[in-house]
Regions:
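Conserved pre-motif I regulatory segment
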Residues: 2-4, 20, 31-84
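Walker A/P-loop
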Residues: 63, 77-102
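Hydrophobic positions in the central parallel beta-sheet of the AAA+
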Residues: 83, 111, 153-155, 174
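Conserved strand-helix element at the start of the C-terminal RecA-like helicase core
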Residues: 86-87, 92, 108-119
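Conserved motor-coupling elements within RecA-like helicase/translocase cores
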Residues: 142-153, 167-171
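SF2 helicase catalytic motif II
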Residues: 157-159, 165-175
């Protein structure tokens, strides 16, 4: 996870590394990157109450649980989060809420899933939540057109991992 070639680690590990460094009494400095920003950047405009209000404004026909609101809040407040959630815990609903937030803010979103069946499932779930998926979402796998004007691309990692960096430039958020 650490690259000796460039001296970098995955941003998702920063919290673990800083906790370890503090526990051991090490001093450290987190530098801001011109492309990625600061690894512990926060969005001070995001509040738990605001997240609840936003999700309720989506008019979902399903109940949203407290832990789902908390996960959505964490992702929006802290910009970079790794969410671990068990099967049937409503991950699609959490992802949908995050996607809707970003699309409402005029951001393009890339959703990466491990299998083609999950591309289809995510698309279907978004449709069941009442969104016009045909207008907003593009499914990308197994030879589908990679370049689209849709705001949201749902793809398998296998379909995009060999793409040049330029392919990813249009995306403002990756889930």
């Amino acid at each position: 996870l650490y690259s000796p070639a460039n001296g970098e680690i995955y941003c998702g590990l920063v919290d673990y590394l800083t906790d370890w460094a503090e526990e051991k009494g090490y001093d450290y400095v987190l530098d801001e990157d011109s492309y990625y920003g600061h690894p512990q950047e926060t969005n001070d405009l995001i509040t738990p109450e605001g997240v609840v209000g936003f999700v309720k404004s989506l008019g979902l026909s399903v109940s949203v649980r407290d832990y789902q609101y908390q996960a959505i809040y964490e992702c929006l407040k802290y910009n970079r989060r790794l969410l671990l959630s068990p099967t049937a815990s409503g991950k699609s609903l959490m992802i949908y809420s995050l996607v809707r937030y970003h699309v409402n803010a005029n951001r393009n979103v890339l959703i990466v899933v491990p299998t083609t069946s999950l591309v289809e499932q995510m698309y279907k779930d978004f449709k069941e939540y009442g969104w016009n998926v045909g207008h907003y979402c593009h499914k990308l796998y197994a030879g589908a057109e990679k370049y689209t004007e849709h705001e949201v691309v749902i793809s398998t990692w296998q379909s995009i991992y060999k793409e040049p960096k330029k392919f990813f430039d249009k995306f403002d958020a990756v889930i």
